[in-house]
């Protein structure tokens, strides 16, 4: 039986269109993860972002805001991606912007080009 605990993920650059699309995909998962939105800046203020559908609260980009997440998605600027790597070098990062692809420790993946037997299979209920 699969665990139903809610995973915790962070999204740096939480106010971008890419982050919004990522949130839609993640919220459709079961169980949906708890999503922690992080602004691409290090300002000490909490940022409120409003669009047509919802209001999002984003915390500043700090080492503390990156703690306790299973994974951090990078959806902001190249500068915010580099700052995230510096602040939390041991945190698993998924760079959706390819800002860190030249880092020596980066693991590049192209799921659509991988053999079918290495892709994650969808669970059926």
Residue map of PLM features:
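N-terminal Rossmann-like NAD(P) cofactor-binding subdomain of oxidoreductases
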Residues: 1-125
